[in-house]
C-alpha cells in the first residue's frame, strides 16, 4: 500500500509540475518540497536540489541567521557624543551621532516617530544651549557602498531599493505627493515628506487617464536629486509615490539641526559625514546618551511581515561585523554561509548577494531553505520567535490573499517572494496536530501571475490532503 501511495504521489507531482502554469509558460521551472516535522519524512521533493531565484523568501535566511547569531535581546545602538568640553551651556567642539546601523530611526512602523525631539530634549536637559563645532554623522559602522551586488539600475532611486547606510532616516523613504490635471499635462508637486534641505525632484511625470501608478524614480546614492518618470492618473488632487532618500545621514542631520533650533539650541558649524572611525583631527569623544532600537524579534517580525527590503539589508550588513571591523556585503555573505555550514547544511546550494532578495543574482535550492526551516523549527532556541514573525496565509501581510477560503486559510505561516517571472512561498503549515515545513519556488513563468498563484495553491492543498489521507 505504501509503495502504491508513493507511486501515486510521484504521478501527482509530475502532473502538477507539468500543469502548474498556463500553456504560455512552457519554460517555467518548479521546485517543491514538504516535510512532516514530527516524523521527519520529506513526502514531496520535486526538483528540490535545483538552484532558483528566490526573491523575498531570501529574507527568511537573513532573519533566521540574525536571530541565531545576535539573539533575542539584540538592539541597534546609536550613540550621541561630543568631542569637546561643555562649558556654560556651550559645547566647545562637535556634536557627533555615532551610528550603529539602526534601520528604524524615524520609521513609520513605530508608534513614536519623533525621536529627534527626544534627542533634543535630552540635550537641553543636559544643559546644552549652543554647539560651536559641527554636527557630525559618524557612519563608520558600515562601508560607503550602500547597494548590494546585482541591484538593477532602474530600481535605484525607488523606495524598495533604498540603500544601506550606517545612519538611516524614516526608512530611507521619501513620499512625494502630486496634483495631476488633464491627460498630457505635467503634475505639480504639492508635498514632500520628510522635508529634506537641498532635496530636488526633477519632475518628468505626465498625467494620463487610466494610467494608475506607472511612475518611478531614478537617482544615485548620496545624491539629493531624484528624477520622477512615467505616468500617473489624471485629475487627482493627491497622488503620492515613493522614492528613496539619497543621503539619509545628511537628511537626518538636517532634521536634527532644525529640531535643535526649535528647542533653543543653536550651532555655529556645518553638517558633515565621517565614514572613518577617527575624525581628521583626533579628539577624545564623550558619550552623552545611547538611543536603543526595539529588540531584534520585533525587527524580524517587521521584516518578514512587511517584506521590507531596507530593514532586511541593514540586518544582513550588520551580520558582517561578526568578522569585519566595518560592515560590508562581502563579509555578510560569508557569515551567513559559515553559520549554516556549521549546522550541517549544504551551502553549495546557497548563492546569495543580498539579504532581501531584490537581486536576481541570488540563487538557492528549495532543499537548502527547507533544511533551514526544519532546523529553526526543531533545534533553534529561537523557534517561536522565528515562527511568529511569519504572516498568516489568508489573513495577514503579503500572503493575506493566499489560500483564502480554503482549508489552509489561517493555518499556513508563509513568506512570499515575487518579481518578474518569479513566485515563491516558504514557511510552515499547521493543521490540527500536524506541522509541516514547505518551500515552493517557481521561476521563468510567463503570463498571468494570479493564475500562477492559483495553481500553486491547488498544488499545496493537493499534496497536504493526499499525505494526510494515507
Model-derived regions, located:
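Bacterial Sec-dependent N-terminal signal peptides
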Residues: 1-25
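A short, well-structured edge-of-sheet supersecondary motif
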Residues: 24-46, 272-273
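Short glycine-rich loop/turn motifs
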Residues: 29-32, 300, 312, 423-426
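Residue-level preference for non-acidic, small/hydrophobic
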Residues: 40, 57-66, 135, 167, ...
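Small-residue-rich helix-loop
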Residues: 42-45, 114, 306, 313-470
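Short active-site loop at a secondary-structure junction
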Residues: 45-65, 69
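A short glycine/serine-rich beta->alpha loop
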Residues: 46-52, 242-243, 358-359
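Conserved serine DD-peptidase/penicillin-binding transpeptidase domain
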Residues: 69-347, 462-463, 467-469
Amino acid at each position: 500500500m505504501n509503495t502504491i501511495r508513493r507511486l501515486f504521489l510521484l504521478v501527482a507531482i509530475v502532473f502538477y509540475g507539468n500543469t502548474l502554469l498556463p500553456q504560455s509558460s512552457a519554460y517555467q521551472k518548479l521546485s517543491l518540497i514538504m516535510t512532516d516535522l514530527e516524523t521527519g519524512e520529506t513526502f514531496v521533493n520535486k526538483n528540490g536540489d535545483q538552484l532558483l531565484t528566490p526573491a523575498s523568501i531570501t529574507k527568511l535566511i537573513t532573519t533566521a541567521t540574525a536571530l541565531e547569531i545576535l539573539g533575542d535581546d539584540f538592539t541597534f545602538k546609536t550613540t550621541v557624543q561630543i568631542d569637546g568640553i561643555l562649558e556654560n551651556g556651550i559645547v566647545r567642539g562637535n556634536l557627533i551621532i555615532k551610528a550603529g546601523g539602526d534601520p528604524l530611526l524615524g520609521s513609520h512602523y513605530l508608534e513614536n516617530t519623533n525621536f529627534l525631539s527626544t534627542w533634543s530634549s535630552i540635550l537641553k536637559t543636559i544643559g546644552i544651549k549652543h554647539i560651536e563645532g559641527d554636527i557630525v554623522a559618524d557612519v563608520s559602522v558600515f562601508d560607503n557602498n550602500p547597494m548590494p551586488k546585482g541591484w538593477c539600475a532602474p530600481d535605484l532611486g525607488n523606495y524598495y531599493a533604498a540603500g544601506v547606510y550606517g545612519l538611516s532616516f524614516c526608512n530611507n523613504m521619501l513620499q512625494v505627493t502630486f496634483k495631476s490635471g488633464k491627460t498630457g499635462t505635467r503634475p505639480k508637486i504639492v508635498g514632500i515628506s520628510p522635508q529634506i534641505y537641498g532635496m530636488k525632484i526633477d519632475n518628468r511625470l505626465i498625467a494620463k487617464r487610466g494610467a494608475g501608478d506607472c511612475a518611478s524614480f531614478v537617482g544615485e546614492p548620496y545624491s539629493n536629486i531624484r528624477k520622477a518618470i512615467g505616468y500617473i492618473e489624471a485629475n487627482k488632487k493627491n497622488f503620492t509615490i515613493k522614492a528613496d532618500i539619497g543621503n539619509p545621514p545628511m537628511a537626518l542631520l538636517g532634521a536634527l539641526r532644525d529640531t535643535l533650533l526649535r528647542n533653543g539650541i543653536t550651532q555655529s558649524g556645518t553638517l558633515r559625514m565621517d565614514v572613518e572611525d577617527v575624525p581628521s583631527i583626533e579628539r577624545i569623544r564623550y558619550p552623552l546618551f545611547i538611543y536603543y532600537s526595539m529588540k531584534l524579534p520585533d525587527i524580524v517580525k517587521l521584516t518578514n511581515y512587511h517584506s521590507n527590503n531596507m530593514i532586511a539589508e541593514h540586518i544582513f550588513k550588520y551580520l558582517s561585523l561578526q568578522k569585519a571591523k566595518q560592515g560590508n556585503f562581502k563579509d555578510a555573505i560569508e557569515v551567513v554561509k559559515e553559520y549554516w555550514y556549521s549546522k550541517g547544511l549544504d551551502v553549495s546550494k546557497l548563492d546569495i548577494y543580498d539579504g532581501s532578495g531584490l537581486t536576481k543574482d541570488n540563487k538557492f535550492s528549495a532543499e537548502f531553505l527547507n533544511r533551514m526551516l526544519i532546523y529553526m523549527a526543531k533545534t533553534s532556541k529561537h523557534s517561536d520567535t522565528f515562527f511568529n514573525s511569519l504572516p498568516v496565509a489568508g489573513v495577514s501581510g503579503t500572503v493575506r490573499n493566499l489560500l483564502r477560503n480554503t482549508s489552509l486559510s489561517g493555518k499556513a505561516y508563509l513568506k512570499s517572494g515575487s518579481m518578474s517571472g518569479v513566485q515563491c512561498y516558504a514557511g510552515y503549515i499547521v493543521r490540527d496536530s500536524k506541522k509541516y515545513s514547505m518551500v515552493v519556488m517557481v521561476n521563468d513563468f510567463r503570463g498571468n501571475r494570479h493564475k500562477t498563484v492559483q495553481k500553486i495553491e491547488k498544488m499545496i492543498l493537493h499534496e497536504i490532503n493526499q499525505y494526510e489521507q494515507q
